[in-house]
A protein has these predicted regions:
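A cross-domain feature marking catalytic cores of carbohydrate-active enzymes
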Residues: 10-12, 57-61, 83-87, 122-125, ...
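Active-site beta->alpha N-cap acidic-glycine motif
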Residues: 2-77, 122
Length: 204
C-alpha cells in the first residue's frame, strides 16, 4: 500500500489583498488599512506548534517588506518560506516584463526579511493560464525550483485546464527549462472537476 502525502500550504496575505474586492486593489491605499497579519499569524503559528505540523507559507513580498518580523517568526518556527508574488496581481493581466519585475521584487523583499530566498512560488489566484506559458521560464530564471500555481480546472481567475490530472509533474518550459509543478488536486463529480480544498471554503 502506497502512503499518501498531505501538504499544508498557507498564502500569507492581508484581508485587503483579496482579488475580487475592487475597492482595495490599489497598492497606494494598503498602508492605510488596519492589518490583521501580525495578530492572526501569531495565532496560526501557535496552533501549528501545538499540532506539531509544519507548513509552506507562500508570502507576499509586500507583507515581507512591511512586516518583516512576521516572516522571521515563520522561519524561526521551522516552516518553509515561499513566494506568493509581490503585489498580488493576476499573472494573465501582466506582461512578461512586469511579471519578472514583480517576482524579483518579491524574492528580494522576502530574502531581506528573513535571510531566505524562496525556491517555491504560487501565483495569486492560481492565475498562470494557457495564455501565459512564459511565466514558467520567468520563474525558472528567478531560481524557482517548484511551483504551485496550476489549477487544473475552470475557475473565475482562469485555470490551466490542459494540464491534465491534478498530480505533481515536471513542466518543461518554452526555453527548455524545468519547473516541478505541484497542482491543486480535484475530484471528478458528475462529470465536473471539483477542487475540494483551499481557503475559499473557510469564507462561506
Amino acid at each position: 500500500m502506497t502512503d499518501k502525502m498531505t501538504i499544508l500550504t498557507i498564502d500569507l496575505e492581508d484581508w485587503f489583498h483579496i482579488l475580487d474586492f475592487k475597492q482595495t486593489q490599489s497598492e497606494n491605499t494598503w498602508i492605510s488599512y488596519e492589518s490583521r497579519i501580525e495578530k492572526l499569524t501569531s495565532k496560526l503559528l501557535k496552533f501549528l506548534e501545538q499540532k506539531q505540523v509544519k507548513a509552506t507559507f507562500f508570502i507576499l513580498g509586500w507583507v515581507a517588506k512591511n512586516f518583516p518580523n512576521v516572516v522571521k517568526d515563520i522561519h524561526a518556527s521551522g516552516h518553509e518560506i515561499a513566494c506568493h508574488s509581490n503585489l498580488h496581481q493576476l499573472v494573465y493581466k501582466m506582461t512578461q516584463e512586469s511579471f519578472k519585475r514583480d517576482t524579483m521584487d518579491a524574492l528580494d523583499n522576502i530574502e531581506a526579511s528573513c535571510g531566505v530566498r524562496p525556491i517555491a512560488y504560487r501565483a495569486p489566484g492560481f492565475s498562470i493560464t494557457a495564455q501565459t506559458p512564459w511565466a514558467f521560464d520567468t520563474l525558472a530564471d528567478a531560481g524557482i525550483k517548484y511551483d504551485c500555481s496550476v489549477f487544473p480546472a475552470p475557475r473565475s481567475h482562469g485555470g490551466l485546464i490542459g494540464y491534465g490530472a491534478g498530480i505533481p509533474a515536471i513542466i518543461r518550459t518554452i526555453n527548455d527549462k524545468e519547473v516541478r509543478e505541484f497542482p491543486i488536486n480535484y475530484v471528478n463529480l458528475m462529470g465536473r472537476k471539483i477542487v475540494y480544498s483551499g481557503g475559499g471554503y473557510f469564507r462561506l
